């Protein structure tokens, strides 16, 4: 048991915890980041469809239970970087109406005390941090911003481009996904991403995704002496003197 004092303790290293650690690292505060998992191994199985989807190699085997005590298999993984290690890299901004009261089939999502306008500058920062590629103005549902995406949209594969154009000819509005991947289409020799067909749902063997591990936790822990990362540290309970 450590008796060290920390100014900030962050539980989890996914999109929330990892991003927070990266943002606070330059503050000089003494920061401890606790992660119940370890670093996801780079191995041939990263791109093995059977291992990834049939054997659930990178998902926890634990079972959760809903309010009716029915079992749930969460399909989540415990790694440095959290579930961003296996996401497809699509990073959308919430729409303005998402912060309002929204009536769903199963209930009501209450109105937020903060609105999209409060988050807009932080969305812009996050898109830079996660190297998001996209084109403003294509998505007719996107919320307002005066800032372009940090990188140009990823070009479509030929067949997808044909479908894109066919939909446009029908008066529809297809758009390029905002993708957080380390792809350099100007100079492919400098590109980490190789544009393979094992992305969404797979770990990336070549570290081509802009995830919370590569873009946040490793820079924070490696470059700032005030940030400590403790892996395989599951938090079961939090005590407070308040």
Identify the residue ranges that each predicted region occupies.
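Conserved beta-strand-loop-beta-strand element in the redox core of flavoprotein oxidoreductases
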Residues: 237-242
């Amino acid at each position: 048991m450590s008796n060290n004092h920390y100014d900030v303790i962050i539980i989890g290293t996914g999109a929330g915890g990892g991003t927070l650690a990266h943002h606070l690292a330059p503050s000089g505060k003494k920061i401890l980041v606790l992660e119940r998992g370890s670093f996801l191994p780079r191995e041939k199985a990263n791109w093995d469809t059977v291992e990834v989807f049939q054997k659930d190699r990178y998902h926890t085997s634990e079972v959760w239970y809903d309010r009716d005590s029915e079992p749930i298999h969460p399909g989540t993984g415990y790694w440095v970087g959290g579930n961003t290690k296996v996401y497809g890299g699509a990073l959308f901004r919430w729409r303005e109406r998402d912060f309002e009261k929204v009536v769903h089939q199963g209930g009501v999502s209450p109105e937020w005390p903060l609105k999209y306008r409060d988050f807009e500058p932080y969305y812009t920062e996050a898109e830079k941090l996660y190297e998001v590629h996209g084109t403003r103005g294509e998505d007719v549902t996107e919320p307002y911003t005066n800032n372009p995406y940090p990188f140009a949209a990823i070009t479509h594969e030929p067949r997808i481009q044909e479908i894109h154009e066919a939909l446009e000819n029908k008066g529809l509005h297809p758009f390029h996904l905002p993708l957080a991947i380390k792809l350099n289409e100007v100079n492919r020799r400098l590109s980490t991403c190789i544009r393979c067909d094992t992305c969404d749902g797979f770990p990336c063997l070549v570290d081509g995704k802009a995830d919370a591990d590569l873009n946040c936790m490793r820079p924070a822990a490696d470059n700032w002496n005030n940030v400590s990362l403790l892996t395989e540290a599951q938090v079961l309970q939090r005590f407070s003197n308040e």
